[in-house]
């Protein structure tokens, strides 16, 4: 479950969509190209949006793999994606639209350069023992 309250988007550094294919990386260092990321086994053609229907569970977690649900069926959360860009995952939602939030809401529709008042910072702390 990510961002249960849905009050702002947060970036997930280790989850990208590159050319429609979802890639994941569980540990740093992260990048914005997908280099050294692993294929999750989920690909979306073109671009689109819709209520989530199916999900795939793997060691990367549970990730949406199909749309066709509604606001009252399946996960009841939405998915936006853009297969034409390298998109950094946004999770949570935003407080200015009640339908743009939820425990499973996923946005793969924006590049890392996207900035808005409703997008939080990507906090990351790496501890190195000396």
Segments the model singles out, each with a brief description of its role:
Residues 7-17, 33-130:
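C-terminal, surface-exposed recognition/capping segments
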Residues 3:
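Short, acidic, Ser/Thr-enriched surface-loop or helix-capping motifs
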Residues 18-28:
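A short, polar/charged loop-to-alpha-helix boundary motif
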């Amino acid at each position: 479950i990510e961002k249960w309250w849905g009050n702002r988007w947060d970036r997930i550094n280790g989850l990208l969509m590159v050319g429609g294919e979802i890639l994941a990386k569980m540990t740093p260092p992260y990048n914005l190209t997908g280099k050294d990321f692993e294929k999750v086994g989920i690909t979306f053609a073109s671009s689109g949006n819709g209520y989530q229907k199916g999900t795939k569970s793997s060691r990367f977690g549970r990730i949406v793999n199909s749309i066709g649900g509604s606001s009252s069926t399946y996960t009841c959360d939405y998915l936006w994606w853009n297969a034409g860009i390298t998109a950094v995952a946004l999770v949570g939602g935003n407080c200015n639209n009640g339908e743009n939030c939820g425990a499973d809401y996923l946005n793969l529709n924006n590049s890392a350069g996207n900035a808005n008042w409703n997008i939080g910072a990507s906090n990351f702390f790496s501890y190195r023992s000396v």
